[in-house]
UniProtKB/Swiss-Prot annotation:
GO terms for biological process: photosynthesis, light reaction. Its main location: membrane. Keywords: Antenna complex, Bacteriochlorophyll, Cell inner membrane, Cell membrane, Chlorophyll, Chromophore, Light-harvesting polypeptide, Magnesium, Membrane, Metal-binding, Transmembrane, Transmembrane helix. It is a single-pass type II membrane protein. This is Light-harvesting protein B-800-850 beta chain A. The gene is pucBA. Residues 2-19 are cytoplasmic. SUPFAM superfamilies: Light-harvesting complex subunits. The core complex is formed by different alpha and beta chains, binding bacteriochlorophyll molecules, and arranged most probably in tetrameric structures disposed around the reaction center. The non-pigmented gamma chains may constitute additional components. It comes from Rhodopseudomonas palustris (strain ATCC BAA-98 / CGA009).
Length: 47
């Protein structure tokens, strides 16, 4: 049996989960940057 931590995940599983969380955060950030840019460009009250 693999060595489990308090979370019930192995080190490999937690590293894989961390990679997905970081990737999701980067994608969310990129979408947010594009959305804020478009809101600035197309919203006359922001100029």
């Amino acid at each position: 049996m693999a060595d489990k931590t308090l979370t019930g995940l192995t080190v490999e599983e937690s590293e894989e989960l961390h990679k997905h969380v970081i990737d999701g955060t980067r994608i969310f950030g990129a979408i947010a940057i594009v959305a804020h840019f478009l809101a600035y460009v197309y919203s006359p009250w922001l100029h």
